[in-house]
Amino acid sequence: MQREKIVVIGAGAFGTALAVVIALENRHDVTLLGRDPSLMADLRNERVHEAALPGVELPDALGFSAEPDVLAGASIVLFAMPSQAHADAAQHYGPYLASDSIIVTCAKGIDRNSGRLLTELLETELPHHPIAVLSGPGFAADIARGLPTAMAIAAEDATVAERLATTISGKTFRLYASTDRIGVQLGGALKNVLAIAAGIVEGAGLGDSARAALISRGLAEMSRLIVAMGGKADTVRGLSGLGDLVLTATSHQSRNLRFGIALGRGEGKDMSGGLVEGAFAAAVAARLGEHHAIDMPVTEAVAAIIDGNLDVASAMQQLMTRPITTE
């Protein structure tokens, strides 16, 4: 395998975890790029990122930089910043990209300003670069600690997807190639919304049966929207759909689940535990459903609760009194 230069942009938990797991293999030259020179210097010198990944040792093979010119010659560039920061990052770093760089978005969200998928946004900002997406069931802490993790990576060109999967995969981090960028992205965004729904049910003490019902009916909503927007139904049953939903809606490592639990308990919109992508994606997903004439009652209820337009008890009453239909 050819040694490649890989740059991960975004020194948060997920970006750092990806940089760590790729660098550990020592098959490629890997650099973590962030905007804070002081932070990047600390990471380089101390070899630990206590704020994002406490207790995880950063490998000697991993480089750190706050200088955009480190992107020169990079064949693969991972965008690991939050979804709402993608447009700014593309504009900031775009001029420094090598002409043949493949861009991989690693965020699980939808641009809330335009309602566009992140691959669409990046294609507008970086029109001369292939754009891929990495998504699936993987918590940053698990990835960084070398716990077995499998995710999906999708590109329009199957050859590009397979190259990325082969290049980035390692002993504990396995990627499956796909050409369904739409399905992989929507699965990653919608599972966050459904994890909030699962958390609301848990926080309100509505029981495991209600949680199972919301997750399964939410999965049906995910499938309908993915197909309506041009994705593949099979993707819903894969890592970026069902796999990520199971993880995010059941594990208390999930920020979205914890956020939902707080809502269910009436504690308000507490985002002190970190970024909650589903809180931004809910309203956008509901609008996409309306635009494509897709019935998405669970997603709409979550969006209304987050916006303060509906309380939990009323939301559950509305869901339970909807007209009876077939599954």
From Swiss-Prot:
It comes from the Bacteria. Sn-glycerol 3-phosphate binds at residues 108, 136, 191, 244, 254-256. Transmembrane segments: none annotated. NADPH binds at residues 14, 35, 108, 140, 255, 275, 277. GO terms for biological process: carbohydrate metabolic process; glycerol-3-phosphate biosynthetic process; glycerol-3-phosphate catabolic process; glycerophospholipid metabolic process; phospholipid biosynthetic process. The active site is at 191 (proton acceptor). SUPFAM superfamilies: 6-phosphogluconate dehydrogenase C-terminal domain-like, NAD(P)-binding Rossmann-fold domains. This is Glycerol-3-phosphate dehydrogenase [NAD(P)+]. The gene is gpsA.
